[in-house]
């Protein structure tokens, strides 16, 4: 709900699927080791050229589910990108 302020963010606009996956994974790991509690991931709302679902949005959803450092995530508030961005809550580093 945006009640926990995000500490770092990443923008995946303009990246290929492979670049976005690698950068998102690296960003989440680095944020976790820096003991961030919440981060912002901007994937955008752009639809692919043939009018199908936004690729980075759906891929980001899948990738975040696979990362062990991620506790939860949800769409951001409008001021932070709305449905084109995600708040990601990270697990606490022990």
Each language-model region and where it sits:
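Long, charged, low-complexity intrinsically disordered regions
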Residues: 1-38, 42-94
